[in-house]
Regions:
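N-terminal small-domain helix-loop-helix segment of the aminotransferase-like
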Residues: 3-99, 106, 280-283
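A short helix-loop-beta submotif of the ANL/AMP-binding
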Residues: 134-140
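A short helix->loop->beta-strand "cap" motif at the edges of active sites that frequently abuts
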Residues: 137, 194-197, 225-226
Length: 386
């Protein structure tokens, strides 16, 4: 390196390569079954692929509108009305983004100012905190305790201050596989009603909810939705994570600020994919309606196949992840255990501690069951040797 080379001072000095990238690379190196990263090993709907090819062939290959293709925004509005009893305005309240992660980043950047405090529920998805920190915000954390990972509303209330700007929630919850209930949203509203606090609701697994009462969305709460951004993901719903198309729903005033950020992050999202997704929403709504049963069968197959293992499987109410307690098997910390599991047993998992800022004393790993049945059975066969 030249003496004239400049080394930038990192804005995120405590971050390196994500654990998901590390574990997937380790799985490939050791020919392990990869249940670490959250993506399917099967393809999405044939009709969706055909519509993508159609729109490419028809020449829909230039920039889409910054806010998203009109047909897709209108289809999202109709779906939202069907599911949650609230129809957002397709022109002013729905924004299509380059995956849910961009929506989350744009929302946080639009709302959080230097010195603002943002409350997260830990364990939490790893993209929240860096986005807050890059905006000069400070993350405050409410710990969710296993095995049920329910919000502690007294602990939440204790964190509220005049500096609190935003609350980030996630339901169905990654990584715990728990879901919020209507009572949780009522408790949240009661806590913040008299304060100027926004809500960012990460609902990318909205269609993978096994709770009897179904998915509870912030959009179904008439008061909270007036100050909330709800984020969703077509990649999760249609098994097409590589397409990176998501969207967010928010009141017009909030959407206007979010769009200011979005236009300078990506400006627009893949045009033919948006058109294909609009067609899919209209032509085959049964896909998202039947998705809970589709994944419930995989969950139950995997749990039953693991019945002979010494892993203790925690309740799974939503998402395509299972948590497993390995306390009966090893005293290793969860990162070391996942490395050992990948190298010696041939199954890759994610340690739960990476989703937490504070030390995590529990021996829990996350396993993804968005896989073919043969993949799940092969993984269970290896895990049953533990």
């Amino acid at each position: 390196m030249s003496n004239n080379a400049l080394i930038p001072q990192s804005k995120l000095p405590n971050l390196g390569t994500t654990i998901f990238t590390q574990m997937s690379a380790l799985a490939q190196q050791h020919n392990a079954i990869n249940l670490s990263q959250g993506f399917p090993d099967f393809d999405g709907p044939t009709y969706l692929q055909e519509r993508l090819a159609y729109h490419v062939a028809q020449g829909a290959n230039q920039y889409a509108p910054m806010t998203g293709v009109q047909a897709l925004r209108e289809a999202i509005a109709d779906k939202t009305a069907e599911l949650y009893g609230h129809k957002p305005d397709a022109n002013s309240e729905i924004t299509v983004t380059a995956g849910a992660t961009e929506a989350l980043y744009a929302a946080i950047t639009a709302l959080v100012r230097a010195g603002d405090e943002v409350i997260c529920f830990d364990p939490s998805y790893d993209s929240y905190a860096p986005a807050v920190e890059l905006s000069g915000g400070v993350v405050k954390r409410v710990a969710l305790q296993p095995p049920h990972f329910r919000p502690d509303w007294q602990a939440f209330a204790a964190l509220l201050s005049d500096k609190t700007r935003l609350v980030i929630l996630n339901t169905p919850h990654n990584p715990s596989a728990t879901v919020w209930q209507k009572a949780d949203f009522a408790a949240l509203w009661q806590a913040i009603a008299e304060r100027e606090i926004y809500v960012l609701s990460d609902e990318v697994y909205e269609h993978i909810c096994f709770a009897e009462e179904g998915h509870a969305s912030v959009l179904a709460h008439p008061l909270l939705r007036e100050r909330a951004i709800a984020v969703s993901s077509f990649g999760k719903t249609y098994h097409m994570t590589g397409w990176k198309v998501g969207y967010c729903v928010a009141p017009a005033a909030i959407s206007a600020e979010l769009r200011k950020v979005h236009q300078y992050l990506t400006f627009a999202v893949n045009t033919p994919a948006q058109l294909a997704l609009a067609d899919m929403l209209r032509a085959e709504p049964e896909h998202y309606r039947e998705l809970p049963d589709f994944y419930r069968k995989r969950r139950d197959l995997f749990v039953n196949a693991l019945s002979k293992s010494r892993l203790e499987i925690l309740p799974c109410e939503g998402t395509y992840f299972l948590l497993a307690d390995y306390s009966a098997i090893s005293d290793l910390d969860d990162v070391s255990f996942c490395q050992w599991l990948t190298k010696e047993v041939g199954v890759a998992a994610i340690p739960l501690s990476v989703f937490c800022a504070d030390p995590f004393p529990h021996r829990l790993i996350r396993l993804c069951f968005a896989k073919q049945e043969s993949t799940l059975l092969a993984a269970a066969e290896r895990l049953n040797t533990l």
